[in-house]
Swiss-Prot record:
Coiled coil: none annotated. It holds the Pfam family Ribosomal_L16. GO terms for cellular component: ribonucleoprotein complex; ribosome. This is Large ribosomal subunit protein uL16. It comes from Methanococcus aeolicus (strain ATCC BAA-1280 / DSM 17508 / OCM 812 / Nankai-3). GO terms for biological process: translation.
Length: 173
């Protein structure tokens, strides 16, 4: 069955459901690497992508943002000129009670009986002001880090802002 739209899971309107003991099979998150680039490098400047609202971000949105941001940063800064880090983990289990529609659906569907639903994915719960992605780099590459985070922002289901954390005094506006 097709993937439901993100708006179905965006709001935080239920308690966190991270208990995997009662669920038969939870799909693995699509995010494969949480740290990219020069993992051991010590860079003087950090640029963050900060969320403006409380929201759930699905694992496939995090992965697509990682791919876009990492590829752009790697092309502009080189393989060892940056450190790209996703700072949230998708713990929240997303469930879907599939409903049959069409001819004969009443004979197939259970309706609201046993409506716990099957696990269809995971999401990260983030709060307003939380940093979700950080790029550490040199002062010369800050403009590229900002552009990479702007591209990551386009993949997110929420408005975000780009903030320079550590090393703001080294960066020329």
């Amino acid at each position: 069955m097709a993937l439901r739209p993100s708006k179905c899971y965006r709001e935080i309107n239920k308690p966190a459901y991270t208990r995997k003991k009662y669920i038969r099979a939870v799909p693995q998150p699509k995010v494969v690497h949480y740290v990219n680039g020069n993992k051991g490098g010590d860079f003087p400047v950090e640029v963050h992508l900060v969320v403006k609202d409380d929201i759930q971000i699905r694992h496939n949105a995090l992965e697509s943002a990682r791919i876009v941001g990492n590829k752009y940063t790697q092309n502009k800064c080189g393989r060892l000129g940056y450190k790209f880090q996703i700072r949230v983990y998708p713990h929240q289990v997303l469930r879907e009670n599939k409903m049959a529609s069409g001819a004969g659906a009443d004979r197939i569907s259970d309706g609201m009986r046993l409506s716990f639903g099957k696990a269809v994915g995971t999401a990260a719960r983030v709060r307003k002001g939380q940093k979700i992605i950080t790029i550490s780099t040199t002062p010369e590459n800050v403009i590229h880090a900002k552009e990479a985070l702007r591209r990551c922002n386009m993949k997110m289901p929420v408005k975000c802002k780009i903030v320079i954390g550590k090393g703001a005094e080294l960066v020329k506006n």
